[in-house]
Amino acid sequence: MTKATYSPSENVYEADEAYWQGEEFRKETPCFPKSVYKYLPDLLNECILEEEGDREQDLSFLSNLTALSSVLPATFGIYNHKKYSPHFYSFGIAPAGSNKSIAQTGRYLLEEVHDWILSNSELQQKTYNHKYTQWKLDCTYKKKAHEECPEEPEKPAYKMLFLPATTSYSRMQIQMRDNGPQGSIIFDTEAQTLATANHLDCGNFDDMLRKAFEHENIDSAFKINGLAPIYIRFPMLAMFLTGTPSQMASLIETSEKGLPSRIMLYTFRSIPKWKPMGDDSISVSYTHLTLPTNR
């Protein structure tokens, strides 16, 4: 809970006390056991930032796990008589100055995969444009000869792995539909970005996030989508966010809607430390930390 503006009312005092209780709780939250890191597969083991502190390692590890869950679309399991993919939601919560940006390692893992998917989509669009132009020419000649036009080529879906956090309800639905069994991920180190979009009139996609987590069908028929309604069967979505406690409160205003129970929360509070510019650490940008792609 966030600190409220000063007021003599009892509610403000209660909110203030709850805020500091939360901050004290964050100081005592445990780190992942060392045994977790001891038996990691090589792919994950190579992603561990050994020179960082325990909190940074944990946050980076959670980021990597969430990212990898989004690129295993052919992997499934059964839980409570339901079929689930590995996709899951996680949220790293800590005050400002806690080095939460280290969680970008998960995004770096997927950048090359995302670029590969975009390149394929752009190539398919160019191929379609060529076929469509040729189809129009053929139709012109066929009409002059009083012959039937050939079937119009089908426009391919434009796929991408990352769903932008700045989006609308309809745009998110369309992209999840276009991605199909490939799946998607929302990855943003500023939870406020998604919270702001969710509060817009064109947003309000809490229900879609809840359904996607459970792989429940998502249907809609808005005017903006044209005559054909949108049907998404077995949606697959992963989500990783980091932010401050107030950003979490802005995104998850109440537990009654059910979204909090679907998110893995990792919260902590640590003493901010200055990192000198002349340290010996190496860059962990996507040029050094990427998944292999089958081209």
Give each language-model segment a name:
Residues T2-L289, R295:
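Phosphate-handling catalytic cores of nucleic-acid transaction enzymes
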